[in-house]
Amino acid sequence: MNVPATPSRLAAVSLRVGDVSKSFVAPDGSDLAALERISLSVRPGEMLSLVGPSGCGKSTLLRLIAGLETPTAGALWAGDELIAGPSADRGLVFQDPNLFPWLTIRRNIQVGLSARGVLRKKRHEVDEFLRLVGLEEFAGAYPHQLSGGMAQRVALARALINHPGILLLDEPLGALDAFTRMKMQDEVLRLWQARGTTMLLVTHDIDEAIYMSDRIVIMTPRPARIERTIDVRLDRPRNRSDSAFLAIRKEILELLHFAERA
């Protein structure tokens, strides 16, 4: 499949999270600490996963990076830019594709361009991205006519058409069956390798994190801190039954078990 020639590989940016903490107000009026002094650097074009117990603050960190929340303390930078709000240079894909049911697949992908007021100039890119995610034959279809994996590919195309330097993936494959999930892991990797976008993936699936990532950040229960960062030095494509793969899996399980007991 041909990949559209785009500037996004050159536009991939670094990310820095500097001593960030985040608290919310609990129903009883007390402070509820979600994140505690998180510091993290992500290289341009890197694929990094966040793994940790449910409710530990992984999605909160992603929302801070997206500019949808503000930190209680610390700061975040995308490249040299202080993150102070949402930006088209930071795309976000959720577990639910959030497609507009009354719009065709083509028009769902166009939404981001329309919001930025550049649809007329870049209308041709919609066709390119339909081809990129293998849905050119479904351009006139509606979301209810797609499978879960196909709908998630539309969500990825909608995020990527803005050429974000950073793409944030919040459990985007979590609702899919095991077979479709593995196929979509390869699909996301293909898009990442073709476009060079910096990607951060939140996942509860340890095998998914190892299969896809350059590095894996292990987070503690709330208030989340970084327990350890693991370099995944395995050749691609990766074999889930390889002894080195299984050794990393064992290490992560032990870290998560230790973090929950600490």
Where are these predicted regions, by residue range?
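Short coil-to-helix segment of the ABC ATPase nucleotide-binding domain corresponding to the Q-loop/switch region
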Residues: 103-111
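Conserved ABC transporter NBD signature motif
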Residues: 74-86, 122
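Helix-to-loop junction immediately C-terminal to a conserved catalytic motif
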Residues: 66
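Conserved signature/switch motifs of ABC ATPase nucleotide-binding domains
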Residues: 141-144, 162
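Hydrophobic anchor residue at the start of the ABC signature
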Residues: 156
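Conserved ABC ATPase "signature" region
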Residues: 110, 117-138, 190
